[in-house]
Amino acid sequence: MGMSRRMFLTVYGSLWLLLLLSRPGVSKPQLCQTCQNLVTNVLKGIEKTAGLNFGGGNTAWEEEKLSKYEISETRLLEVIETACDKSDFDCNKMLEQNEEHMESWWFKKQKEQPDLFQWLCMDTLRLCCPKGRFGADCLSCPGGTEKPCSGNGQCNGDGTRFGTGVCDCYTSYGGPVCMDCALGYYEQARNESHLVCSECYRACSKCIGPGDDQCVLCKRGWLLHDGKCIDIDECGTEKDHCKSNQFCFNTDGSYECRECDKSCIGCMGGGPARCKKCNKGYYRDGVKCLDVDECDSELPKCKGSHEECVNTEGSFTCVCEKDYSRIDGMCRPDSYDSNAEKGLFDDITDDEVVVLQQMFFGVVICALATLAAKGDMVFTAIFIGAVAAMAGYWLSEKGDRALDSFMKGR
């Protein structure tokens, strides 16, 4: 391969790597895994196509043809066609961008570089390292290549050309090489190569054994006393940070802020008996804040025609009477046709009718009284008759209902 061709492949491979790394969702260590999967599938394809289409007959002829087929372009194409699933974007992209490398290995490098994974993924594309190594220079992971992180954690970037090499210790382990017990765990057994860590009592952050009296340090919210961790009552020491309409509820090692009862304005605990003050719509009955029944009042709360009051917790609501429904803000009979043409006085309520009646009679009587005062006997007689008629109307059953409706209001 000429110098210019090698340079082209190097630049082309670098551009491909940058393109793949820039794709959202692709992590650097994942590229090594993609390369490893590709190599695994290629090797499976090589195994599957070994001796393909040769099943007996002229042995000399078969040996000649087989030796040609073994490293033929036909066989390489058959292997490559099955190397990636159609839905595996990363694998197909890697294969597409590295066909030149695959051909170079297939035709020229196989015998001297039989390990395709090492040649392609480690040495050529520089995506992977041997197990127990990490980073651009394939440095040894903490704890050694044989047992990275002492077997109690995961070396960051292990087996790839990426990562920091820092040990991510498993639960219960800690330290730079995961050979210490984490906070909340104690050393149960240890030798030169193995460590067993077990959990402390739940209140201990550091301990020498599993018992509640073997604590060395306590978790937040607990106080160490004679080897035991005692719960701190944040509610009793006023260390809580609850809002004005919440109360403090102590828990093991902490506390909770819980909502006051809806009948309360400020409280010292749960329920209507722990209120500091009663909320609007409630009254204090002994020690409890109870709901005020606004509907049980001499003054009607619902002033609309055919409305009735329904008490609710801390308030009330106005609903239409039976066989009535609210239409256009008013309680109408269920048979009411909202599309029917309305008359001039259809929207006048009973209370408004009473007021109009009073105004009409008032004007008439005032006019008659003025004329009667001038000594006109005819108008005097009419005035007396009008007063008598008006009195008779108000004494009638209809007048009583109208007056009662007016006095009670809407």
Curated annotation (Swiss-Prot):
Q: What happens when the gene is disrupted?
A: About half of the knockdown tadpoles exhibit severe defects of either early gastrulation disruption or edema and late embryonic lethality. Some also have tail defects. Surviving tadpoles show more robust seizure behaviors than wild-type in response to pilocarpine treatment.
What are the GO cellular component annotations? membrane
**What is the superkingdom listed in this entry's lineage?**
Eukaryota
Q: What are the protein's GO molecular function terms?
A: calcium ion binding; isomerase activity
Q: How does it sit in the membrane?
A: Multi-pass membrane protein
List UniProt keywords, sorted A-Z. Calcium, Disulfide bond, EGF-like domain, Isomerase, Membrane, Redox-active center, Repeat, Signal, Transmembrane, Transmembrane helix
Q: Where are this protein's FU repeats?
A: 194-243, 254-301
User: Which segments sit on the Extracellular face?
Assistant: 30-352, 396-410
| Membrane-spanning ranges | 353-373, 375-395
Q: What is its main location?
A: membrane
Do the record's keywords include Calcium? Answer: yes
Q: Where is the EGF-like domain?
A: 139-179, 291-332
Family (UniProt): Belongs to the CRELD family.
User: What is the annotated role of this protein in its UniProt record?
Assistant: Protein disulfide isomerase. Promotes the localization of acetylcholine receptors (AChRs) to the plasma membrane.
Q: What is this protein called?
A: Protein disulfide isomerase CRELD1
What is the species listed in this Swiss-Prot or TrEMBL entry? Xenopus tropicalis (Western clawed frog)
